[in-house]
Amino acid sequence: MSQPAFKIIIVGCSVTGLTLAHCLDKLGVEYTILEKRSAVVLQEGASVAVMPNGGRILDQLGLYDAFEKATVPLDLTDAYLPDQDFRFTSDYPRRVLATFGYPVAFMERRGLLEILYDGIADKSKIHLNKGVTHVEQNDDGAKVHTEDGEVYEGDIVVGADGIHSKTLREMWRMMGEPVVNGIAQSESQNMSVAFSCVFGISHDVPELQPGEQILRMCNGSTIFVMGSKGVVFWFIVTQLNRRYEYHDAPRYTTEEAAAFCEARKDAEIKEGVTFECIWRKQHVFNMLPLQESLFQTWSHGRVVCIGDSVHKMTINLGQGANCAIEDVTVLCNMLRAFLAEKREKKPSYSEIDTLLRRFNKEHLPRASTIVETSRLTTRVHAQVGISQRIMTRWVVPYFGKFLQGKPLGLIASGPVLDFLPLKRASYPGWERYRVKKSSRGAGFWITAFLSLSLLAVAATMYGWGNSQIWADWNIL
């Protein structure tokens, strides 16, 4: 009698969960998706950035063409500092496209979900209104129980259910972890909330062109505005009055969000354009606390969590969805090799536990680098601290082109699916900027970046600004 097919239960029909489904389809691995909501695509007012490291994986899966047709690449970024008379223009988005063959581009989150959902051949594998109540596992497999009394069985349970992940909390329960105020005691220092964000989408704003990006850095807040096809995506990220924990983070009503925006309608976005020009054309908006987290333990037994459930960052770096897509990529690469080795033999509980622990250990440093870089970027944009103010006023405007190696390296060092061909591998930036693995983590590079900032100020003072040495360094 043949063994039943190896099967994965995905909790969450998110960008993460649907990307995983596409990868499993390519691998020929059975799966079921459980989604607690009544629809896959809902209008929530959120947009999502797809960077080259995420875009090339979507391209491997045959999904990028639809995304590319629906978006406009960012071209130049006009950055304004609190001093209204000081601004500079960065060609970083343009350089990203030339370097990797993929642009920085935004679209509505629901639009990306539609692309991912439409690409699923067998939609009967997706089950809506399936809120998870509890998970159990043993030597024979895993069972996921839902609110309607149904039970779904598989070999691995993957939590792709976001920041408030039920799967993660079930994993903590099975580990015997004490949970205090919604977070495992051992992870309590690994999540905090220090910023809020109002994000919105406006239609028909003629003052802003497709591909135009404006970054308005203020003391304690940042305004982002990106023009696309007939719409404008915008965010206002604001530092909170203190650092909050998960359970006591502020929650905002629609009325509070509207009042927040009304109070800022006179804020200048660019010459002749105030925030009111965008706000009065808003189609949808929302206000949320921005959690920042990097949990250390992602798996236990047959259960593994990925995406926002284990690492969450602010929107400033634009890597949230891309980091989740990378999680899927690394997990599926390891799963492919694992199942090929097992052939027809059913993997044991211990073997699966070892596989998922190895995934956690090997991918955690990459996720940590992205989360820490995002954390620094957010504070630089909001002018939090003297070092950050020095960086934005004296370093980036004059030396930004020479310091782009680090963010380009962050993109180039992302993983790819090792069982599908690359579509735009010929672009030289992937190899040129790829960072070799080393013991130097994000903390080292952040310290180096701040140190170089001070050195660059000295260089400006002493007239070194045009020296070729800065171009040759290209380390940050």
Curated annotation (Swiss-Prot):
It comes from the Eukaryota. Keywords: FAD, Flavoprotein, Glycoprotein, Membrane, Monooxygenase, Oxidoreductase, Signal, Transmembrane, Transmembrane helix. Glycans are attached at residues 190, 219. One of its GO terms (molecular function) is monooxygenase activity. The chain crosses the membrane at residues 441-461. Coiled coil: none annotated. FAD binds at residues 35, 49, 109, 308, 321. It is found in: Membrane. Its cofactor is FAD. Pathway: Secondary metabolite biosynthesis; terpenoid biosynthesis. GO terms for cellular component: membrane. Belongs to the paxM FAD-dependent monooxygenase family. PANTHER family: FAD-BINDING DOMAIN-CONTAINING PROTEIN-RELATED (PTHR47356:SF2), FAD-DEPENDENT MONOOXYGENASE ASQG-RELATED (PTHR47356). This is FAD-dependent monooxygenase dpasE. It comes from Apiospora sacchari. The lineage of its organism: Eukaryota, Fungi, Dikarya, Ascomycota, Pezizomycotina.
